[in-house]
Design a protein with these regions (language model features):
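N-terminal beta1-alpha1-beta2 module of alpha/beta enzyme domains
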Residues: 1-71
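Internal, glycine-rich beta/alpha segment that forms the wall or movable "lid"
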Residues: 1-4, 79, 85-133, 144-147, ...
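An alpha-helical appendage that flanks or caps ligand/catalytic pockets
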Residues: 2, 94, 98-103, 142-246, ...
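Hydrophobic faces of well-ordered beta-strands that scaffold small-molecule active sites
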Residues: 6-10, 41-43, 77-79, 109-115, ...
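Active-site mouth loops of central-metabolism enzymes
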Residues: 10-24, 81-89, 108-117, 221-229
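Short, acidic/polar
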Residues: 20-33, 92-93, 115-123, 232-239
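Glycine-rich, proline-tolerant flexible connector loops at the mouths of alpha/beta enzymes
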Residues: 40-64, 83-87, 137-142, 250-261
């Protein structure tokens, strides 16, 4: 039996939207985070630099990690490291943690390598005993790659004398919830268009769609949930069936909707979706 945990994750795309905006820098996370049943806060970026001697911490990382620390217990803080990875990945991660320990209140306690479709992240994570962060879990190609990623991760762990643990596998799934799908779709009209070029570049949607068509496409291809708690539960069950079980479900802290509607979506997810899975439990073979 695997106890599924839930959390939020900030990615480079979302962080870029916040730079230079002191109000959003301060308020992107939940002010009452510990009260809403979320059990993890993650930040994903390209931390490890390609050459030795350079800082492993990008200039903006310290402030974001400090913000995370203010809203979560240290045991719940995670870092997802995005490709490209260097040959000396382990020394790079150790350098990163050492620098963060000097610069922030508490250093993160969970490290995972981010994977989209390529098997590289699963291979390296399995070899070095890092977690696996499936940032592209709901893209068409990323969803299809989930079973092979776990097989590679588990095989590499076994080859290095360990048994892979599913609770070290986190999936990212974009969601915005409201009481009705119509309300949710109306709310994300506020900011969804700024993500359109990125989604087109990733091959998730065609380019130059209207905001309404963009939202409908994201829903139809299962990349995102823009709807009700029942839609969110259906998506999570779909991911559980595809993977055989994983440890964490992370919601991107994006700017689709305004701050009030975003916080209400987080709260609704907590009251309904998290409560559903905590009451029913989730299992993994």
């Amino acid at each position: 039996m695997l106890n599924l945990k839930f959390g939020l994750i900030v990615t480079p795309t979302d962080n870029e939207q916040r730079r230079g905006d002191p109000e959003s820098q301060e308020n992107w996370v939940l002010p009452d985070f510990p009260l809403l049943n979320y059990e993890a806060l993650w930040f994903a970026d390209s931390f490890v630099m390609p050459t030795t001697g350079e800082s492993a911490v990008n200039p903006h990382v310290r402030d974001i990690v400090n913000a995370i620390v203010r809203h979560a217990q240290p045991s719940n803080i995670g870092l997802g490291i995005l490709p490209p990875f260097t040959k000396n990945i382990r020394s790079g991660v150790e350098q990163l943690l050492s620098e963060l320990q000097q610069q922030v209140t508490d250093k993160p306690t969970a490290i995972a390598l981010a994977a989209q479709v390529s098997p590289e992240s699963a291979q390296i994570a399995g070899i070095h005993d890092y977690g696996l962060l499936s940032v592209g879990a709901t893209t068409p190609a990323g969803f299809g790659a989930l079973p092979s990623h776990w097989e590679i991760y588990a095989r590499k762990a076994k080859e290095n004398g360990r048994k892979a643990q599913r609770d070290k596998w986190a999936l990212v799934a974009p969601m915005h919830l409201a009481e009705t799908r119509e309300q949710a779709m109306h709310q994300v009209l506020a900011g969804i268009d700024q993500y359109g070029p990125l989604y087109a570049e990733m091959g998730i949607t065609p380019s130059r769609l209207s905001k309404e068509a963009l939202i409908e496409t994201l829903i139809e291809n299962h990349f995102a949930v823009v709807g009700t708690p029942d839609d969110a539960i259906e998506q999570i069950n779909r991911l559980l069936a595809q993977t055989g079980g994983f440890g964490k479900l992370l919601l991107p802290a994006n700017h689709w909707a305004n701050a009030r509607d975003t916080l209400q979506s987080y709260a609704l997810f907590s009251r309904t979706v998290i409560a559903h899975f905590k009451s029913t439990g989730s299992s993994s073979q």
